[in-house]
């Protein structure tokens, strides 16, 4: 008798995606981050659902409702801290996933790559709106500063900001709509993930060597299901370690003070995973220029496939490109550090230098290094 997973219309889809899927035999741990992101998304939706049952999106009660969740709701504190810290894990996995795509040339699957960029933007928007919900000092001022950036758009900027705010400042209307969007966006992300996987399974997965692996495939189960399970275990262990021992390590102390529109914090900054983009924004003295640089710092990923000049797909055998890639990683770490520092000398200069280097590496140096490598190999 034929196995039900191969005949049942629904189980057949699961079977072709998770069990009998032909996968390259040599994919490394860098390919684990996709499944880890899926795990993060599912767990974020679950914890978020339980938090939404007790949260109230009103400026008068939002802060106290979060306090109520932590103090009075059964296991509310752990649900809240898991939700907050898993967003950090989400972005760590996300950046590693994108980094792996750049290093091993996965961006040559343009459909999958472009849906991935759309996913990145959507996840960033969701995380930003989630950061506003506890209605602490940094939540309020972060929302004010970041939404205000849209006022740099010529002609329609001011109207656009007031339309998003639902008034003349960040207030009750803003909080209510941010909560509504924060609730609905993860489900839109889930739909986009399905499309992302659909495009990926059209081409099959890339592998570290960048060479087509059609002649050497193995079934996804049990080989990669076990490998993913180990990744899940490590991620959950790290998350529990963070949420149970140092739950506020990645948060901002200002968020323990209720939002006060009359008192500005000395240093307004977003969550740590947005600091690299925030540093690029601040490094340009002009408001519109800064906003364009901020958007381009992420949107630049969309033109990476067009800048691929190498005859090889992966960086595995390209030492020059490897060196530049790791300089890019170090540059992003520097930008993240600068984004968390006050706007004063020498941080301004370091931020400007790191921002220029970021764009120079991606737009000029990396394509140039690929051409030099082609020349060395006489290709």
Curated annotation (Swiss-Prot):
Gene3D superfamilies (UniProt xref): Cytochrome Bc1 Complex, Chain C
Predominant subcellular localization, coarse grouping: mitochondrion
Binding site for heme b b562: 83, 182
One Pfam family linked to the record: Cytochrom_B_C
The protein's required cofactors: heme b
Binding-site list for a ubiquinone: 201
Keywords, ordered alphabetically: Electron transport, Heme, Iron, Membrane, Metal-binding, Mitochondrion, Mitochondrion inner membrane, Respiratory chain, Transmembrane, Transmembrane helix, Transport, Ubiquinone
Transmembrane segments: 33-53, 77-98, 113-133, 178-198, 226-246, 288-308, 320-340, 347-367
A GO-annotated cellular component: mitochondrial inner membrane
CDD domains per record: cytochrome_b_C (cd00290), Cytochrome_b_N (cd00284)
Residues that, per the record, bind heme b b566: 97, 196
GO biological process, one term: mitochondrial electron transport, ubiquinol to cytochrome c
Location in the cell: Mitochondrion inner membrane
Cofactor detail note: Binds 2 heme b groups non-covalently.
GO MF terms held by the record: metal ion binding; ubiquinol-cytochrome-c reductase activity
Topology in membrane: Multi-pass membrane protein
Further comment: Heme 1 (or BL or b562) is low-potential and absorbs at about 562 nm, and heme 2 (or BH or b566) is high-potential and absorbs at about 566 nm.
Function: Component of the ubiquinol-cytochrome c reductase complex (complex III or cytochrome b-c1 complex) that is part of the mitochondrial respiratory chain. The b-c1 complex mediates electron transfer from ubiquinol to cytochrome c. Contributes to the generation of a proton gradient across the mitochondrial membrane that is then used for ATP synthesis.
Subunit architecture: The cytochrome bc1 complex contains 11 subunits: 3 respiratory subunits (MT-CYB, CYC1 and UQCRFS1), 2 core proteins (UQCRC1 and UQCRC2) and 6 low-molecular weight proteins (UQCRH/QCR6, UQCRB/QCR7, UQCRQ/QCR8, UQCR10/QCR9, UQCR11/QCR10 and a cleavage product of UQCRFS1). This cytochrome bc1 complex then forms a dimer.
Family per record: Belongs to the cytochrome b family.
Protein name: Cytochrome b
Organism this protein belongs to: Pronolagus saundersiae (Hewitt's red rock hare)
